[in-house]
Amino acid sequence: MILSSDHHQNDLSSLLPKHVAIIMDGNGRWAKKRGKLRAFGHRAGIKAVRSAVSFSAKHNIESLTLYAFSSENWNRPEQEVSSLMELFIFALDSEIKSLHKHNIRLSVIGDIGRFSERLQDRIHRSVKLTANNTGLQLNIAANYGGRWDIVQSVQKIAQQIKDNSLEQQDITEELVNNYMNLSQQPQVDLVIRTGGEHRISNFLLWQIAYAEFYFTDILWPDFDENVFEGAINAFAKRERRFGGTIPDDADVGS
């Protein structure tokens, strides 16, 4: 059960994250433990995606961002990359009607121009179908990298300066943020990483500046609503400072 009975219902909105981002790690190791190829683990991970989406929708989380394919993943074996691309198409084809039925809005962030025309078409059609939905905002980060995101923002600002539509002294943190992916959504409150690793892996470098982190040894295909609930409960107990401090007389250990 999320939180305890000590919390009044009207306090829940301030304790629960509005935006959760997940680094879905461990598919390959999950498959290896079962004597299978990595592709088997990636396919098994779809069930965990369903669980994460369902949990988020049920608990009124506004945005869920899933790290599906990083810009560095192109360095994996060609057969695995090809399998991932086909799995992406399969997932879109099999899940989009359900997402639409449940009022979930889909967005894909990243440099999708490197994908095949077939995959790009599936992405555009899926995003268009759900564009007017008003429930959970589901973001899939595909061919995405945090550094790439910052660079593309800077490039757009540089073009404005070149076009004489922006003065250099007018560049602010807010302006840079406006050109970043997810800028129109709540800031990321909680980052969950499965698989036991404790690193960011070039994910949402700008957007997670004040996020809380939750690491679990659970491999992604085994991620379910109970694991998600544990992360949310841990988040609710955190003292978020956003770069500030707390009073010296506060009853804390730091």
UniProtKB/Swiss-Prot annotation:
One Pfam entry name: Prenyltransf
EC supergroup of this enzyme: transferase
Known cofactor(s): Mg(2+)
Gene Ontology BP terms: cell wall organization; peptidoglycan biosynthetic process; polyprenol biosynthetic process; regulation of cell shape
Active site residues of this protein: D25, N73 (proton acceptor)
Catalytic activities: 8 isopentenyl diphosphate + (2E,6E)-farnesyl diphosphate = di-trans,octa-cis-undecaprenyl diphosphate + 8 diphosphate
Listed EC numbers: 2.5.1.31
Annotated cofactor note: Binds 2 magnesium ions per subunit.
SUPFAM superfamilies: Undecaprenyl diphosphate synthase (SSF64005)
Positions of substrate binding: 26-30, 38, 42, 70-72, 74, 76, 193, 199-201
InterPro entries associated with the record: UPP_synth-like, UPP_synth-like_CS, UPP_synth-like_sf
GO cellular component: cytosol
GO molecular function: ditrans,polycis-undecaprenyl-diphosphate synthase [(2E,6E)-farnesyl-diphosphate specific] activity; magnesium ion binding
Keywords assigned by UniProt, alphabetized: Cell shape, Cell wall biogenesis/degradation, Magnesium, Metal-binding, Peptidoglycan synthesis, Transferase
Residues holding Mg(2+): D25, H198, E212
Function of the molecule: Catalyzes the sequential condensation of isopentenyl diphosphate (IPP) with (2E,6E)-farnesyl diphosphate (E,E-FPP) to yield (2Z,6Z,10Z,14Z,18Z,22Z,26Z,30Z,34E,38E)-undecaprenyl diphosphate (di-trans,octa-cis-UPP). UPP is the precursor of glycosyl carrier lipid in the biosynthesis of bacterial cell wall polysaccharide components such as peptidoglycan and lipopolysaccharide.
Family, per entry: Belongs to the UPP synthase family.
Protein name: Ditrans,polycis-undecaprenyl-diphosphate synthase ((2E,6E)-farnesyl-diphosphate specific)
Gene behind this protein: uppS
